[in-house]
């Protein structure tokens, strides 16, 4: 069995190495995809603690130099970094891994644009990124491969708890005003709410604490949220691992401190999806809650031959969804 974990570690994770390592190690992954892996020293430290090799999509130049990284217990065969700054907002990392049984598995790690403040314009940008990603991955058709990372998008049919997101954004704005340096990189109201709706700011506290208004906000959020980028991947034949194994579980991954939506995914090629044994979200590990480590929760997918007893629960790990 090969266990894969995808995790946005929030602006490099410099002050949270212990927490991140505890969360990751609790899942006992063979391959780890890290998003916002901006600091090579942090990636190296986590890799050393986990006994893994690592590859990065680029070098460190500044705190917001968004990078992806891959950690692996398994042999790394080759690595490619795809840079298309005219389309892709962050480098696209491709790593070929040799699984324990000798099979080759190509892993792609992405971090799509957020641009939530642009509303449907943001989803249009993500769709252009997905088009570029599909072109890159076309060479792997017919071979096992997967795409994972932070897609900053809600899947068709998924819930969005806009009221939970609003309460989180209000809280983070307040914390940022008190201590800007400590909360750099966390989402805030301006990064999510379109400018044309900024006139609502004086009323947000009232909305966030009114049950009727929250219910209306959740309904509106689910109806008007753009879902085109995830729909494109599904139409291209890629399998949403978590949703395949958990048809009814929301599987929220973000924000970890006030779960509102599922924006982190592991997509498998059809041939690889035939080996999918389980997929789940890690909410706690080794006594560390998810929101202590990052503003995202990690997602796991397990691939094997589905032999009875192989895919049982891992000790020290708390998840959402059944470990099927």
List the predicted regions and their residue ranges.
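N-terminal, active-site-proximal structural segment of metallo-dependent hydrolase catalytic domains
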Residues: 1-49, 56, 60-68, 261, ...
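Active-site beta-strand/loop signature of hydrolases that rely on acidic residues for catalysis
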Residues: 3-9, 20-43, 95, 107-108, ...
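A shared catalytic/ligand-binding motif for oxyanion handling
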Residues: 31, 36, 93-113, 118-119, ...
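Soluble or luminal CAZymes and related metallo-dependent hydrolases
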Residues: 12-19, 87-89, 124-132, 221-225, ...
């Amino acid at each position: 069995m090969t266990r894969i974990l995808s995790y946005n570690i929030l602006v490099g994770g410099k002050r949270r190495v212990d927490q991140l390592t505890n969360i990751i190690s609790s899942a006992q992954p063979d391959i780890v995809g890290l998003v916002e892996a901006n600091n090579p020293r942090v990636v190296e430290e986590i890799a050393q603690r986990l006994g893994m090799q690592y590859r990065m999509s680029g070098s460190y130049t500044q705190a917001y130099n968004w990078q992806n990284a891959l950690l692996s217990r398994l042999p790394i065969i080759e690595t490619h970094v795809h840079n298309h700054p005219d389309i892709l907002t962050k480098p696209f990392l491709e790593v070929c891994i040799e699984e324990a049984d000798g099979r080759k598995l190509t892993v792609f790690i992405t971090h799509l644009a957020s641009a939530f403040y642009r509303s449907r314009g943001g989803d249009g940008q993500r769709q252009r990124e997905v088009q570029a990603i599909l072109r890159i991955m076309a060479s792997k058709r017919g071979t096992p491969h997967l795409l994972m990372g932070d897609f900053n998008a809600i899947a068709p049919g998924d819930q969005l708890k806009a009221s939970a997101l609003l309460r989180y954004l209000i809280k983070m704005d307040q914390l940022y005003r008190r201590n800007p340096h400590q909360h750099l990189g966390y989402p805030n109201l301006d990064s999510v709410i379109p400018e044309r709706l900024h006139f609502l700011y004086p009323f947000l506290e009232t909305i966030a604490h009114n049950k009727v208004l929250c219910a209306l906000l959740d309904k509106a959020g689910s109806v008007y949220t753009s879902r085109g980028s995830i729909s494109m991947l599904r139409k291209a034949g890629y399998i949403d691992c978590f949703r395949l194994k958990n048809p009814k579980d929301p599987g929220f991954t973000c924000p970890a401190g006030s779960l509102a939506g599922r924006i982190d995914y592991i997509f498998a090629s059809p041939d690889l999806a035939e080996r999918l044994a389980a997929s789940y979200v890690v909410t706690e590990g080794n006594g560390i809650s998810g929101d202590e480590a990052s503003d995202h929760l990690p997602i796991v997918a397990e691939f094997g031959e589905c032999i009875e007893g192989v895919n049982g629960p891992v000790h020290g790990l708390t998840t959402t969804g059944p470990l099927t």
